[in-house]
């Protein structure tokens, strides 16, 4: 089975042993080397391909995607990011030079890390307040602590305390059968954490794509430590969007009973979303990304997917000296 992504050119391939090929100007997704066609879509309308599970991609399609900047992303059934073919960086070399310079200057690096943390805490606070969570006001203390942080250790301490308070309150918003004690990952210990991990993986992928389009290197960040193979800047950028996009989708799916406990399989010792339930999750995810709202800084209505790119470009403007500081996206 294959899912088209809301008219924005994202194709999700859910079928195990799917066969992806290029036939003329068309992407063809079939079962077992062409025996049963699952999806045909003009390649000009394909911006990204997300593969969950095992699939074969023909050399001709790989070549096309590499030449045209179409990302191919491999995820496990639990949403873990395995590998990907991403678009080549833009020609904006000055942006990357400025990015590396900021990373090497401790004061600048700390200031950027602080902006990402503040964006995360502020939006998390608004999210909890809007949803009527008890204890949302406690995040104000962590916010003040982050604002006053003078070094990375203090900043990360404030972020950690804010995250602990946030997830305690978030868990109380969930249906009783999905409540959890703390955030868990690798592997997630309960269905709600499993959905959160999945949503965060997809959000990180979106942020990585936005940064590449804007001309930045997703692997050199400021808040998250730089490690081999870790998209640190993508993880930085996604912080201000965790509650706005990922947590919002998960909360809506669970509270509206669109995803239930029966949609999870724990035969491998941890819960994971059944293949049959993936379309429900992906429809909700794409629906949220395509939702349009007013961007507070730019003063115009944009889809959330466009806002991710807008924020990446705002970061570029700051790095190049066109803005005095990076302004995180803020919900009202």
Curated annotation (Swiss-Prot):
Family membership noted in the UniProt record: Belongs to the CRISPR-associated endonuclease Cas1 family.
Alphabetized NCBIfam families for the sequence: cas1 (TIGR00287)
Protein name: CRISPR-associated endonuclease Cas1 3
Keywords for this protein: Antiviral defense, DNA-binding, Endonuclease, Hydrolase, Magnesium, Manganese, Metal-binding, Nuclease, Plasmid
GO MF annotation terms: DNA binding; endonuclease activity; metal ion binding
UniProt xrefs under Pfam families: Cas_Cas1
Subunit structure: Homodimer, forms a heterotetramer with a Cas2 homodimer.
Enzyme Commission number: 3.1.-.-
Domain of life: Bacteria
Residues annotated to bind Mn(2+): 159, 224, 239
Organism: Thermus thermophilus (strain ATCC 27634 / DSM 579 / HB8)
Top-level enzyme category: hydrolase
Cofactors (names): Mg(2+); Mn(2+)
GO BP term (any one): maintenance of CRISPR repeat elements
Role, per record: CRISPR (clustered regularly interspaced short palindromic repeat), is an adaptive immune system that provides protection against mobile genetic elements (viruses, transposable elements and conjugative plasmids). CRISPR clusters contain spacers, sequences complementary to antecedent mobile elements, and target invading nucleic acids. CRISPR clusters are transcribed and processed into CRISPR RNA (crRNA). Acts as a dsDNA endonuclease. Involved in the integration of spacer DNA into the CRISPR cassette.
């Amino acid at each position: 089975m294959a899912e088209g992504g809301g008219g924005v050119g994202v194709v999700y391939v859910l079928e195990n042993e799917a066969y992806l090929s290029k036939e003329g100007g068309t992407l063809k997704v079939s079962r077992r080397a062409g025996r049963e066609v699952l999806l045909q879509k003009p390649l000009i309308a394909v911006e990204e391909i997300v593969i969950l599970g095992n699939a074969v991609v023909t050399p001709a399609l790989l070549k096309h995607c590499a030449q045209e900047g179409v990302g191919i992303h491999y995820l496990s059934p639990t949403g873990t990011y395995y590998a990907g073919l991403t678009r080549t960086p833009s020609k904006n070399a000055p942006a990357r030079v400025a990015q590396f310079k900021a990373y090497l200057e401790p004061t600048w690096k700390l200031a950027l890390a602080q902006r990402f943390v503040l964006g995360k805490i502020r939006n998390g606070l608004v999210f909890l307040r809007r949803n009527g969570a008890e204890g949302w006001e406690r995040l104000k203390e962590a916010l003040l602590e982050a604002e006053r942080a003078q070094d990375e250790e203090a900043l990360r301490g404030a972020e950690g305390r804010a995250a602990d308070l946030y997830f305690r309150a978030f868990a109380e918003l969930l249906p009783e059968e999905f409540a959890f004690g703390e955030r868990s990952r690798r592997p997630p210990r309960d269905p709600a954490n499993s959905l959160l991990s999945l949503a965060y993986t997809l959000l990180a992928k979106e942020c990585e794509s936005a940064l590449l389009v804007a001309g930045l290197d997703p692997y050199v960040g400021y808040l998250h430590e730089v490690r081999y193979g870790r998209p640190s800047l993508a993880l930085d950028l996604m912080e201000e969007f965790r509650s706005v996009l990922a947590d919002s989708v998960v909360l809506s799916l669970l509270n509206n009973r669109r995803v239930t406990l029966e949609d999870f399989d724990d035969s491998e010792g941890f819960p994971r979303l059944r293949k049959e339930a993936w379309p429900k999750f992906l429809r909700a995810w794409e629906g949220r990304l395509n939702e349009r709202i007013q961007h507070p800084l730019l003063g115009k209505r944009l889809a959330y997917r466009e806002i991710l790119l807008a924020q990446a470009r705002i970061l570029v403007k700051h790095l190049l000296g066109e803005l005095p500081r990076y302004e995180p996206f803020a919900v009202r």
